[in-house]
């Protein structure tokens, strides 16, 4: 299994992120996120990645959110937002994306993500479920959620 590492907020990571921008779409770019964290001198990095040798081949950002105001879940637990999961083309379908998601699940908190085009099968396989669309809350996104077994399931449907 691939080892997930917290990525340092520094110029080396900034250079590594540039290789993703070449292959990815603009909305997946994490360069701006990383640059703002560097400017703020934020040492608590939300970025995680997997290396193949010395090369960063998969990455994501993971943020813990205060659950007291969420409408995604039937509880007030804090949850994680998993953003911008991306694996370089030559390394896809080798378990790196799954390893990142399993790493996020290991925190034992519910997870919310916004899937990208053509990724529905991946998120289904990882156990994520759609929530009922809410125009004000979701603002054009189509969020998916995952909840650990010890927390009550909610698909966003009202009783």
Swiss-Prot record:
**Could you tell me one molecular function GO term of this UniProt entry?**
acyltransferase activity, transferring groups other than amino-acyl groups
Keywords attached to this Swiss-Prot or TrEMBL record, sorted alphabetically, are: Acyltransferase, Transferase
- What SUPFAM superfamilies does the record point to? Acyl-CoA N-acyltransferases (Nat)
| EC number(s) reported in the record | 2.3.1.-
Gene3D superfamilies to which the protein is assigned, alphabetical: 3.40.630.30
Q: Which Pfam families match?
A: Acetyltransf_1
Q: Where is the N-acetyltransferase domain?
A: 7-151
Cited InterPro entries: Acyl_CoA_acyltransferase (IPR016181), GNAT_dom (IPR000182), YlbP (IPR017274)
Coiled coil feature spans: none
What top-level branch of life does the organism fall under?
Bacteria
Which protein, by its recorded name, is this? Answer: Uncharacterized N-acetyltransferase BPUM_1403
Which species is the source of this protein? Bacillus pumilus (strain SAFR-032)
């Amino acid at each position: 299994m691939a080892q997930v590492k917290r990525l340092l907020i520094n110029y080396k990571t900034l250079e590594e992120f540039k290789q993703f921008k070449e292959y990815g779409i603009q909305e997946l770019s994490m360069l701006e996120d990383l640059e703002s964290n560097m400017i703020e001198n934020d040492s608590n990095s939300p970025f995680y990645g997997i290396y193949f040798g010395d090369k960063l081949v998969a990455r994501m950002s993971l943020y813990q959110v205060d659950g007291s105001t969420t409408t995604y879940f039937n509880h007030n637990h804090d949850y994680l937002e998993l953003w911008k999961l991306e694996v370089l083309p030559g390394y896809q379908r080798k378990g790196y994306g799954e390893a990142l998601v399993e790493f996020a699940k290991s925190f034992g908190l519910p997870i919310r993500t916004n899937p990208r085009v053509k990724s529905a099968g991946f998120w289904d396989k990882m156990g994520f479920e759609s929530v009922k669309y809410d125009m004000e809350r979701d603002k054009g996104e189509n969020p998916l959620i995952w909840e650990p077994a010890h927390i009550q399931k909610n698909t966003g449907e009202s009783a």
